[in-house]
From Swiss-Prot:
GO terms for molecular function: 2 iron, 2 sulfur cluster binding; 4 iron, 4 sulfur cluster binding; biotin synthase activity; iron ion binding. [4Fe-4S] cluster binds at C56, C60, C63. Binds 1 [4Fe-4S] cluster. The cluster is coordinated with 3 cysteines and an exchangeable S-adenosyl-L-methionine. Binds 1 [2Fe-2S] cluster. The cluster is coordinated with 3 cysteines and 1 arginine. It comes from Cereibacter sphaeroides (strain ATCC 17029 / ATH 2.4.9). GO terms for biological process: biotin biosynthetic process. The gene is bioB. Its cofactor is [4Fe-4S] cluster; [2Fe-2S] cluster. This is Biotin synthase.
Length: 328
């Protein structure tokens, strides 16, 4: 199948027109592009561990880990390396191909970089792909993580540029995009997506995807999150449940605008029916998080995911071979 050239010049008007297509046509276009770039029966798997929880100085209105909100989440210190590696071993045994480590920081301190790099090397030595989400990074920190063997860096832009000020005031969309660009220039693969259900309009969801699809290079992975109900955060008062078909349309639009990117169903799958997840896979989603816990929210039990994939005739994508990590 011929693969159309990837575009980074999408307009909101084009995306809006695609998003509004009759459902069968939208799904057909998304599935056609999905098949041009991926095995349509293969689902990638990742596992996520909070290596430093709570106490974050950012005031993101959706997040349980912000020090600005009274959510009952207690701040912890950075995990010890062996504790992280034990979790990585369990994740691999459960079928994860990638191990993501998240810390609730605005940005990591230089004093923590040695420990973070040791974690990356240790996880890579287990044969897992490595991913971190630590907040904003300096070019020097990007270089150190790259040298340690970090494969992916997650840094979501969360929502549209127009709606961003409604969810955070301690950082800007420009701050987020600057880190994404630093990571890309540093040779680490970019994982960047957003969150639905925070009170944003349909236009904001479309604009979020256009922002990602018009970056100098499309993100390698695009997580699609549904906001989870969290007591004590500002978003709680304006959050609205996302219509199931609206979610499928956004997944399909992500696949069409960024056909070579992995589209991951991330937070919120505990609220999705099997039928809704199946529609999302049909629309082009081809990755999930496995394991009972994400950062501070729940995730479907491993047996449920295995059962769902089996019933759909889908399989876990084979792990990619990773090159050996050079010693310091």
């Amino acid at each position: 199948m011929i693969r159309p050239a990837l575009r980074t010049d999408w307009t909101v008007e084009e995306a809006r027109a695609i998003h509004a297509l009759p459902f069968p046509e939208l799904m057909h276009r998304a599935q056609t592009l999905h098949r041009a770039h991926f095995d349509p029966t293969a689902i990638e798997t990742a596992s996520l561990l909070s290596i430093k929880t709570g106490g974050c100085p950012e005031d993101c209105g959706y997040c349980s880990q912000s020090a600005h909100h009274d959510t009952g989440v207690k701040a912890t210190k950075l995990m010890a390396e062996e504790e992280v590696l034990a979790a990585a071993r369990r994740a691999k045994a459960a079928g994860a191909q990638r191990f993501c480590m998240g810390a609730a920081w605005r940005s990591p301190k230089d004093r923590d970089m040695d420990q973070l790099c040791d974690m990356v090397r240790g996880v890579a030595d287990l044969g897992l792909e490595t991913c971190m989400t630590l907040g904003m990074l300096s070019p020097g920190q990007v270089a150190r993580l790259k040298a340690a063997g970090l494969d992916f860096y997650n840094h979501n832009i969360d929502t549209s540029p127009a709606y961003y000020a409604q969810i955070a005031s301690t950082r800007t969309m420009e701050d987020r995009l600057e880190t994404v660009e630093q990571v890309r220039r540093g040779g680490i693969k970019v994982c960047c997506g957003g969150i639905l259900g925070m009170g944003e309009a349909e236009e904001d969801r479309i604009a979020l995807l256009v922002t990602l699809a018009t970056l100098p290079a499309h993100p390698d992975s695009v997580p699609v999150n549904l906001w989870n109900e969290i007591e004590g955060v500002p978003v709680q008062g304006r959050a609205r449940a996302v219509d199931p078909f609206a979610l499928v349309r956004i997944v399909a639009l992500a696949r069409i605008l960024m056909p070579a990117s992995v589209v991951r169903l991330s937070a919120g799958r505990t609220e999705m029916s099997d039928e809704l997840q199946a529609l999302c896979f049909l629309a082009g989603a081809n990755s999930i998080f496995v394991g009972d816990q994400l950062l501070t929210t729940g995730n479907p039990a491993a047996w449920k995911d295995r059962d769902l994939l089996s019933r759909l005739g889908l399989h876990i994508a084979p792990a990619r071979a990773r090159p050996p990590v050079a010693a310091d």
